[in-house]
């Protein structure tokens, strides 16, 4: 079995919010004890509703927020701890494609400078080599070389996201975190960007973490899927196991919401739909965080948090009644 490219061990990210003058200081548990791994060349889908902690987890992996607890290993090297990680070294291994192509690009920089700056910063090649890599990367993402001196406002949303993808890949990283990479784009071009990401994954040997609330996208691109709810992983496994045999009520609720007749098996299970809205991470429910919305909860669920345990080879679920959900 291949060594993990990325390993997270009991990772937690907490923020202090409020003030002593406004009701006191509270702790927001954005990420709460996450253990995950990503293999080289693999695509891990990370799904859940807004507010589940997916983007905060991504920022912790990138070194943009410091974890409160736990360890992060990238390529066998621990990057978490008391000191901030070496951002220069991290950038050569892990990169990120952001959700909003309109906000993630510097409006004062041309495409050429946007792509060349990381190469200059890391001392990659001379002027001719930098230019060659910029033009080559533009071609890889479907941009015309003669547009290298244009500014972001001269491109469509889909083209801007292609620039963002090119910027993420220009240093040839091993892992790319895609944070809702198509949610801000027109429906008509979402498939183009997803297919581009898949082509680049195969061509460059990339591993992805694909963050999305759109399970249709995740099913299409992922080898494995992790389901996150209020900072915790509640289920993970191979994409086929997750979509065809979900063993957590929250996963079933997400699948039931897909407007796709091929997934009606999960949707027609009695009580598949979740009740109400996601709770606040400032005041999560005791026990299983999903219990206020769960259609099969019992008294145990309100006092004891279930452990993420195996239900099949490579398939884990955190539910006291995981064995009943078959």
Sequence positions of predicted segments:
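Helix-to-loop junction immediately C-terminal to a conserved catalytic motif
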Residues: 62
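The feature captures the beta-strand-to-loop junction immediately N-terminal to the Walker
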Residues: 47-48
């Amino acid at each position: 079995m291949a060594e993990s490219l990325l390993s997270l061990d009991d990772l937690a990210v907490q923020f202090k919010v409020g003030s002593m003058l406004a009701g006191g200081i509270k702790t927001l548990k954005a990420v709460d004890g996450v253990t995950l791994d990503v293999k080289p060349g693999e695509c891990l889908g990370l799904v859940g509703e807004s507010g589940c902690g997916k983007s905060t987890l991504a920022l912790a992996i990138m070194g943009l927020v410091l974890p409160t607890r736990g360890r992060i290993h990238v390529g066998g090297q621990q990057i978490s701890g008391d000191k901030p990680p070496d951002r220069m070294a991290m950038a050569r291994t892990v990169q990120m494609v952001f959700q909003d192509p309109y906000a993630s690009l510097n409006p004062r920089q041309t495409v050429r400078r946007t792509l060349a700056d990381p190469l200059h910063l890391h001392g990659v090649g001379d002027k001719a080599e930098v230019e060659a890599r910029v033009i080559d990367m533009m071609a890889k993402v479907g941009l015309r070389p003669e547009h290298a001196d244009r500014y972001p406002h001269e491109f469509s949303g889909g083209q801007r996201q292609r620039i963002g993808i090119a910027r993420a890949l220009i240093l040839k990283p091993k892992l790319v975190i895609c944070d809702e990479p198509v949610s801000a784009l027109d429906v008509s071009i979402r498939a183009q960007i997803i297919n581009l990401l898949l082509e680049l994954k195969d061509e460059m040997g990339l591993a992805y973490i694909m963050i999305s609330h759109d399970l249709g996208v995740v099913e299409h691109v992922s080898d494995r899927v992790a389901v996150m709810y209020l900072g915790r992983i509640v289920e993970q496994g191979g994409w086929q196991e997750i979509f065809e045999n979900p063993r957590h009520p929250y996963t079933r609720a997400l699948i039931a919401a897909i407007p796709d007749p091929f997934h009606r098996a999960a949707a027609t299970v009695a009580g598949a739909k979740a009740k109400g809205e996601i709770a606040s991470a400032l005041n999560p429910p005791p026990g299983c965080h999903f219990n206020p919305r769960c259609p099969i909860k019992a008294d145990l669920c309100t006092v004891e948090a279930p452990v993420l345990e195996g239900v099949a080879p490579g398939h884990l679920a955190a539910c006291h009644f995981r064995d009943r959900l078959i």
